[in-house]
Amino acid sequence: MSTSIKAIKESLEAVTSLLDPLFQELATDARLGVQKALKSRQKAIQTDLAEEERLEAMLSYEKALYKKGYQAIAGIDEVGRGPLAGPVVAACVILPKYCKIKGLNDSKKIPKAKHETIYQAVKEQALAIGIGIIDNQLIDEVNIYEATKLAMLEAIKQLEGQLTQPDYLLIDAMTLDIAISQQSILKGDANSLSIAAASIVAKVTRDQMMANYDRIFPGYGFAKNAGYGTKEHLQGLKAYGITPIHRKSFEPVKSMCCDSTNP
């Protein structure tokens, strides 16, 4: 009696190599259900192999530093440079050596539905996490570039007192005035897993803040646009005026501050 399709599917779930002899054995099984299960498992393995290769490539900076003797590499990234409202948020994350988290990438490349899952995975596996938040008032005072630096420095400071302290910093497109060895990486959130981890922590943290602001200041769509200048946000500005979290140094908010006809 031939093996049931259900049993074959269960056997295939345990297969992790495309060279497994089970594939060759099942290739001669004419049942449509078996062939569908066979192709499905092969495709899943190919997807897993591609993901493993991608994650391995994103560890290249970290692996080079491990070879030089560095043990605790912190990735640093920020979210919120461009919005018209809300803070700029930076995160500093130290992952265990050679740590790979499936799906971890530049937060802009991760589907929103998966943000929370990957964020939780980073929180569970990270050796240390620091978060720096600079509000809109300080952004207006010092400019967004300097505010981003301050947020990053605050994120590093938040690691003080935690068990693991960084001996090297990988930073997304920024150099910081701090006595820790560091490297600035252009598009670092897409090229370093440590920076990608910081990217998703900063992203989810800021999105949660903006969702809270949406409840306090309805009508601007903050929960959906995170403070960026979308059509809904601009319509809200026109209808309801400027809120306490708007950046008055950013246009069109800046011009509205000088226009006495605005609400």
UniProtKB/Swiss-Prot annotation:
Keyword Hydrolase: yes
GO process terms (BP): DNA replication, removal of RNA primer; mismatch repair
Entry's Gene Ontology molecular function annotations: manganese ion binding; RNA binding; RNA-DNA hybrid ribonuclease activity
Residues noted as binding a divalent metal cation in the record, renumbered to the chain: 77-78, 172
InterPro entries documented for this protein: RNase_HII (IPR022898), RNase_HII/HIII (IPR001352), RNase_HII/HIII_dom (IPR024567), RNaseH-like_sf (IPR012337), RNaseH_sf (IPR036397)
Stored CDD domains: RNase_HII_bacteria_HII_like (cd07182)
Protein location: Cytoplasm
A Pfam family this chain is assigned to: RNase_HII
EC number(s) stated in the UniProt entry for this protein: 3.1.26.4
All residue ranges annotated as the RNase H type-2 domain in the record: 71-262
Cofactors demanded by this protein: Mn(2+); Mg(2+)
GO cellular component terms attached to this protein's record: cytoplasm; ribonuclease H2 complex
Co-factor note (free text): Manganese or magnesium. Binds 1 divalent metal ion per monomer in the absence of substrate. May bind a second metal ion after substrate binding.
Reactions catalysed: Endonucleolytic cleavage to 5'-phosphomonoester
Keywords of this entry: Cytoplasm, Endonuclease, Hydrolase, Manganese, Metal-binding, Nuclease
Similarity field: Belongs to the RNase HII family.
Role: Endonuclease that specifically degrades the RNA of RNA-DNA hybrids.
Name used for this protein in its record: Ribonuclease HII
Gene from which the chain derives: rnhB
